[in-house]
Amino acid sequence: WIMGHMVNAIGQIDEFVNLGANSIETDVSFDDSANPQYTYHGVPCDCGRSCLKWENYNDFLKGLRSATTPGNSKYQSKLVLVVFDLKTGSLYDNQANEAGKKLAKNLLQHYWNNGNNGGRAYIVLSIPDLNHYPLIKGFTDTLTQEGHPELLEKVGYDFSGNDAIGDVANAYKKAGVTGHVWQSDGITNCLLRGLTRVREAVANRDSGKGYINKVYYWTVDKRASTRDALDAGVDGVMTNYPDVITDVMNEAAYKNKFRLATYEDNPWETFKK
């Protein structure tokens, strides 16, 4: 999965997919009442990027739905996975459950079209704080109560705070999550970060008894760091330059080992070599 980083304006969806991304990451900011409000990152953000692009969250969802609904004039068949980077740092811990409920209602209405031929992409809810694990239950309970538990088959989870792997496992236990887990590791492209924890996550994924199904590394903008990430065995790389990742994947060392994921590839299944 080549994951386009910080795709917060509707016009950027086509831009990143046309550069080779089959997945995008979108920031979601919340208002004081825990309503998802804008797709907005703000400053500071990655070096070389404009931090200020934004949409109203519901408008972005409608644009995303168009891009991921077969038959729509805006349809992009390659776009199969969306990571919502949930900026819950602005919320009190006791608002996490409420944020999950409201997120579910927004997605149900504006992305899934109330279960009636909505967008088809798989969705990862990425949460920066382990203490905000109740967001997951708020989300899953609400989709079930609204009569659409089947949509949970399209939803996965990530804790993005680079916490110790054991601590992340405990948070999932508390949240009642037993699958559909992506594990992120990374840092802004302005700084360097080694692959120690990535390798630990990959080992957990491949052990057969860990909690992790997929591992992605962010933010990867250079050919050398792309090769390092692929060599470490990641399933996804998040990038500001999808074309760079595409170029590396076409190199002799990688083109027979890796291919771009399609809609037929289940993002919740651990790949067996």
Curated annotation (Swiss-Prot):
Alphabetically ordered keywords of this record: Cytolysis, Dermonecrotic toxin, Disulfide bond, Hemolysis, Lipid degradation, Lipid metabolism, Lyase, Magnesium, Metal-binding, Secreted, Toxin
Catalytic activity: an N-(acyl)-sphingosylphosphocholine = an N-(acyl)-sphingosyl-1,3-cyclic phosphate + choline; an N-(acyl)-sphingosylphosphoethanolamine = an N-(acyl)-sphingosyl-1,3-cyclic phosphate + ethanolamine; a 1-acyl-sn-glycero-3-phosphocholine = a 1-acyl-sn-glycero-2,3-cyclic phosphate + choline; a 1-acyl-sn-glycero-3-phosphoethanolamine = a 1-acyl-sn-glycero-2,3-cyclic phosphate + ethanolamine
InterPro entries named among the record's database cross-references: PLC-like_Pdiesterase_TIM-brl (IPR017946)
Keyword match Iron: no
SS bond partners: 45-51, 47-190
Cofactor: Mg(2+)
Purpose of the protein: Dermonecrotic toxins cleave the phosphodiester linkage between the phosphate and headgroup of certain phospholipids (sphingolipid and lysolipid substrates), forming an alcohol (often choline) and a cyclic phosphate. This toxin acts on sphingomyelin (SM). It may also act on ceramide phosphoethanolamine (CPE), lysophosphatidylcholine (LPC) and lysophosphatidylethanolamine (LPE), but not on lysophosphatidylserine (LPS), and lysophosphatidylglycerol (LPG). It acts by transphosphatidylation, releasing exclusively cyclic phosphate products as second products.
Protein name per its UniProtKB record: Dermonecrotic toxin LspaSicTox-alphaIA2i
Organism: Loxosceles spadicea (Recluse spider)
